[in-house]
């Protein structure tokens, strides 16, 4: 359904029973992400929760009125909360969506019941480590002009964004088979919805000053921090920093995953989430 939030139409799906605790999940990849990713990850929780997934402003099938800033995306999450009539919500996000989940918990502390983070970073230092990891890997030959344009927000159009994303997909998984990696990357890229304006905004305007470390000790909600052991772009060290800074956080490392433990170790990931949610709900209602 289309819902107007803060003057911008968002493509929204609501799963689960009315009256259940609400979880709002933000997708990753500003400009390359859409609601399909959090729907697959958090949708199974709709037997217990009211799960809300959506295409962020400027992403997927949503309208694209700028700015595509972290503050605006967090405000849109709160607009969804108001639209749902929920006093408090659980907020979740993976990768870039984790940035927005943390921004929301910082800006709207009284509205957050709990937070689930997956393979994300508290600041922009993960990009430096990603460059180092890219230089030291042997899966793909890096075209550094394309690589730099992607991570510096210099993408020309949606087709350029799709092509540049497809080139680096093989870096994201724990397991790698050179016989199938390129075809799998092409299939994954073909499933995407591309909005280069939002992508460029992320890396031209948002990331250069992104640093939540000073604010994270003030996050009061219980937080689950998850990460894949071989994540090249938001590595274990980033997750460890988040878990160390948020007072009521616990860290779970998935040993057989890269950037996507929610798919690479799906059963374990679902079990870890449910255990956390049951603890939160029990704590809240005790």
Descriptions of predicted regions:
Residues 248-286:
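Catalytic active-site module of serine/aspartate enzymes centered on a nucleophile-bearing elbow/loop
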Residues 5-64:
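Conserved HGGG/HGGXW glycine-rich cap/lid loop of the alpha/beta-hydrolase fold
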Residues 230-234:
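Acidic catalytic loop of the alpha/beta-hydrolase fold
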Residues 87-129:
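Conserved hydrolase catalytic core segment
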Residues 219, 225-227:
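Short beta-strand/loop motif that positions the catalytic acidic residue
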